[in-house]
Amino acid sequence: SHWRRWNPHLHAPGTLTNDGFGDDWDGFLKAIESASPVVEVLGITDYLTIECYKAVKAQKDAGRLPKVKLIFPNVEFRMTVATDKLKGINLHLLFCPDDADHVDRIERALSSLAFEYKSSQYRCNLAELALLGKAHHNGAIEAGPARSVGANQFKVELTDLRKMFRNDKWVTENCLVAVAASNNDGTAGLQYDASFAALRQEIETFAHVIFSSNAKTRDFWLGKSSSDDLK
């Protein structure tokens, strides 16, 4: 086997929430370029949009990140169902970047998702996330911060995600669903209430990938242990 270093979940400067980078794009890129072992694949992550992916791709196209062989978009969501820690379940959509029009197709698909607030529907795109943020903040907020507020409030339903996949052949063929398995913001946070058992199974069945750094969780999903070993 030949091991390659991937980072499938990397936020970048300008990410809509919890942006700890500021505008230091050069520092961000240099950290990746100088990493050892070399990082060959990056999943550029943002909440509800692919703006950070587009920015990193533009840097790559301009000659930065020469050792990175593949960059793909990772769109992060919080689901409407919450764990016992009161955190929305963390779900990611990992898109294939092979098609030349993948950006347009992804943004079209994301705009099919909506969140209802005070009897109004807000679509999953930058303009309507800003409108949601302003509505939640009573309007007294600039567009940039409003987008962050809107992204923080927007939650997605499992039924809406299923509908998006069902109605969009390109998404079905070019997107993997990943879900966190942690107690904090993952499906393990639903195991303490038996009434959520079926929903937990539905979410995990919908996913293609389970994100976890826990050795017991890894062994369970690799079929090396039983659910009793997770307790």
Description of each model-found segment:
Residues 1, 55-211:
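Extended substrate/RNA-proximal surfaces in nucleic-acid metabolism proteins
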Residues 1-88:
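An N-terminally biased module of ancient metal coordination in phosphate/nucleic-acid-related enzymes
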Residues 1, 7, 180, 226-227:
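C-terminal regulatory/interaction regions
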Residues 212-217:
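His/Asp/Glu-enriched short active-site or ligand-binding loop at hydrolase and phosphoryl-transfer sites
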Residues 222-223:
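Extended non-globular interaction regions in eukaryotic gene-expression and organellar proteins
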Residues 231:
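Eukaryote-biased recognition of electropositive, low-complexity segments
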